[in-house]
């Protein structure tokens, strides 16, 4: 950061006039100068003016480096002229001439390196392993005064690009130190620390010995400025020892990019390589000791014999003792001892029968079995046909229809419709004698009480009439006497006799015997009924013995295996043959000549374009600054666009918020107005109805008349 004097400037023409190619007649003068300079030996060559200018420009203050607008315009026009000359001459140069120019440029590079070794480097050379840098050549800058005003104008040369010092750090690891030097430095630092600690201890001893009552003032040391030490500077691995030979080396730039930088600490030591064996089969795990083989049967037996650890009592004394200091003695042979089991004293009754007992039981069963022969049926000897009884012919099943409830309901409806009305026949009844004696059927007229007139007291309090409670007459219950019972047969209750149930002995032997006899009789009847008829079979004819044909089995016939791989191979072969046929067909079709329409006549003629390449583009080792775009400018544009988008989004958001706020205010205003209208009480006018006009009835009063049922009242 301290190298603020190294500045970076680059002036490139913004407008290039291509018409100057044809106007310039001295375009090839630069190549003539280069060819003349090749004849001068390298020892007698003076320093180039560009190197002198570089030295002068490096010493100039940074404030004076910035050129004026006129100088920049002159320099741009000058660069345009030089570029036009190089571009025109590049077309006429041969290969030999180009090689000479390359050699010349390499020599100029070496001269610049030697001339500028005293000053701090500016740019890393492309393809070289050294870390030397060059100061930029500032165009249009006037030379220093001590060279004189009459000095000739320096010729325009190619500008060498250099990175700005802002993007670089100081070359801290210019020289790598060996391990011995590093150890010595560490020892010196430790010695210094020891000396400082001794001084502090002596000072504290003096203070302690001198008066302890007075307070000692702490001495605060002055802060010392310490330079910044970045960790990234230590990571930079640069080759401090430059290789021997100052020759210019051509290196492929693409391959160097991927190549890791050589570390300065690693120094290759001479000597033969010591071969070491490869431990390929060695595992990471520790070697496990091989245990004795135990079969699964033995493991199972041991598991069942072994008492689980949870049943063992743990003694605290043994746990506290720890491992025994005495060495374990060799194990001796075990003396077998009887376990003194208690199972011999236990005797349980055996429930299982022995083989002898089972055999004796079987013999008894055989002796008890008696063979009972059946009686001979006489009908067999008679030779009559003993036919089985014909089974009784059963009546054929009669189909019975389903009695569905819906059919019953339909039939009932039909029956109701079919019911005819009964013929009404008039039968006269005798006339009751009460009609002739008195009026019958008409109730007597009740006499109403006389109405007492009263004033209609509308304004009085007691105008509301209290309904008179009618006294209900209590109905006198009619007592009806019950009928007298019939005392013809007197009731005599029967006394319950006390009986004692006596248990009598009983047995089912007689009943079982009777049932057994009935069963035997029934079986005899069945046997007599179903006597089989004897039918003798014919004797076989031994004249001709007809044996069945011997079935001769066919031997197994071998068939080839039908493998899936053969099928796949066959399908693949067919596909391949089909593909070959199609390819041959396409080739034959392509061989057949078919003339295409002539479209070249109607197209525009080909016009070769001029090459806009410069001489330096064709040279492999040349370095020309191409147009570039700084990342800061790109980020600034992106940031500007992002801020613009943010501002638009904020504006939209504010508009939406304003609209919602206005809408909310309008809704609140409407609600308040509506509430006001609802809360204000408005008196309604008294309604006026038509007066009630009571009209007198026009119907005359009913005149009561007695019903004249009989003819005696008639005139």
UniProtKB/Swiss-Prot annotation:
Skewed-composition ranges (Polar residues): 47-56, 141-152
Extent of the signal sequence: none
Pfam families: Aurora-A_bind, TPX2, TPX2_importin
InterPro entries membership: Aurora-A-bd, TPX2_C, TPX2_central_dom, TPX2_fam
Subcellular location: Nucleus; Cytoplasm, Cytoskeleton, Spindle; Cytoplasm, Cytoskeleton, Spindle pole
Region (Disordered): 36-167, 260-291, 314-337
Modified residues (Phosphoserine): 204
A single Gene Ontology CC term: nucleus
A GO BP entry: regulation of mitotic spindle organization
Alphabetized UniProt keyword annotations: Cell cycle, Cell division, Cytoplasm, Cytoskeleton, Microtubule, Mitosis, Nucleus, Phosphoprotein
Role: Spindle assembly factor. Required for normal assembly of mitotic spindles. Mediates the binding kif15 and aurka to spindle microtubules. Required for targeting kif15 to microtubule minus ends. Activates aurka by promoting its autophosphorylation and protects the phosphorylated residue against dephosphorylation.
Family the UniProt entry places it in: Belongs to the TPX2 family.
SUBUNIT field: Associates with microtubules. Interacts with aurka and plk1. Interacts with kif15.
Full protein name: Targeting protein for Xklp2-B
Organism encoding this protein: Xenopus laevis
């Amino acid at each position: 950061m301290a190298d603020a004097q190294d500045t970076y400037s680059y002036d490139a023409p913004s407008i290039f006039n291509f018409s100057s190619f044809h106007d310039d007649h001295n375009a090839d003068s630069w190549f003539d100068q280069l060819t003349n300079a090749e004849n001068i030996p390298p020892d007698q060559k003076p320093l180039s003016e560009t190197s002198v200018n570089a030295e002068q420009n490096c010493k100039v203050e940074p404030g004076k480096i910035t050129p004026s607008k006129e100088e920049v315009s002159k320099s741009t026009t000058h660069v345009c002229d030089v570029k036009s000359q190089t571009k025109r001459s590049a077309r006429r140069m041969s290969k030999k001439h180009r090689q000479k120019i390359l050699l010349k440029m390499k020599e100029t590079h070496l001269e610049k390196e030697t001339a500028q070794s005293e000053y701090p480097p500016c740019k890393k050379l492309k393809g070289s392993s050294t870390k030397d840098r060059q100061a930029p050549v500032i165009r249009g800058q006037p030379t220093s005064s001590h060279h004189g005003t009459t000095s000739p104008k320096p010729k325009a040369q190619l500008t060498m690009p250099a990175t700005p010092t802002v993007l670089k750090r100081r070359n801290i690891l210019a020289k790598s130190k060996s391990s011995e030097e590093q150890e010595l430095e560490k020892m010196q630092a430790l010695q210094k620390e020891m000396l400082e600690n001794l001084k502090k201890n002596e000072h504290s001893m003096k203070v302690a010995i001198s008066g302890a009552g007075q307070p000692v003032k702490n001495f605060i040391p002055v802060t010392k400025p310490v330079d910044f030490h970045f960790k990234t500077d230590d990571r930079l691995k640069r080759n401090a020892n430059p290789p021997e030979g100052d020759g210019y080396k051509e290196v492929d730039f693409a391959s160097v990019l991927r190549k890791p930088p050589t570390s300065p600490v690693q120094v290759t030591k001479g000597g033969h390589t010591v071969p070491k064996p490869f431990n390929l089969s060695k595992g990471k795990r520790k070697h496990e000791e091989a245990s004795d083989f135990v079969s699964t049967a033995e493991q199972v037996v041991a598991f069942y014999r072994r008492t689980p650890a949870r049943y063992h009592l743990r003694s605290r004394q043994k746990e506290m003792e720890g491992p025994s200091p005495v060495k374990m003695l060799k194990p001796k042979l075990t003396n077998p001892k009887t376990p003194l089991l208690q199972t011999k004293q236990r005797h349980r009754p055996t429930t299982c029968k022995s083989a002898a007992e089972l055999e004796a039981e079987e013999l008894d069963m055989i002796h008890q079995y008696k063979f009972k022969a059946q009686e001979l049926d006489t009908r067999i000897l008679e030779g009559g046909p003993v036919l089985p009884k014909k089974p009784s012919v059963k009546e054929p099943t009669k189909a019975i229809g389903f009695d569905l409830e819906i059919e019953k309901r339909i039939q009932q409806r039909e029956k109701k419709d079919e019911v005819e009305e009964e013929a009404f026949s008039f039968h006269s009844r005798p006339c009751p004698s009460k009609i002739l004696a008195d009026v019958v059927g008409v109730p007597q007229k009740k006499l109403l009480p006389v109405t007492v007139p009263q004033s209609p007291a509308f304004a009085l309090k007691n105008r509301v009439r209290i309904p008179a409670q009618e006294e209900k007459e209590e109905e006198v219950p009619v007592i009806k006497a019950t009928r007298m019972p019939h005392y013809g047969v007197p009731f005599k209750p029967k006394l319950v006799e006390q009986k004692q149930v006596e248990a009598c002995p009983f047995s089912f032997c007689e009943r079982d015997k009777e049932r057994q006899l009935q069963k035997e009789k029934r079986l005899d009847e069945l046997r007599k009924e179903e006597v089989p008829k004897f039918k003798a079979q014919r004797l076989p004819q031994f004249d001709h013995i007809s044996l069945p044909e011997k079935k001769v089995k066919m031997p197994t016939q071998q068939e080839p295996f039908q493998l899936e791989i053969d099928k796949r191979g066959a399908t693949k072969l067919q596909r391949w043959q089909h593909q070959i046929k199609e390819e041959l067909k396409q080739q034959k079709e392509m061989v057949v000549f078919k003339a295409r329409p002539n479209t070249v006549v109607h197209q525009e003629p080909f016009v070769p374009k001029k090459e806009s390449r410069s001489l330096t583009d064709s040279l492999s080792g040349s370095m020309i600054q191409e147009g570039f775009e700084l990342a800061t400018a790109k980020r600034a544009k992106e940031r500007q666009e992002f801020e613009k988008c943010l501002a638009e989004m904020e504006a939209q958001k504010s508009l939406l918020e304003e609209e919602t706020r206005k809408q909310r205010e309008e809704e609140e205003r409407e609600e308040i107005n509506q509430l006001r209208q609802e809360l204000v009480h408005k008196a309604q006018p008294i309604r006026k109805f038509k007066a009630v006009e009571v009209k007198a009835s026009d119907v005359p009063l009913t005149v009561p008349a007695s019903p004249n049922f009989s003819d005696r009242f008639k005139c």
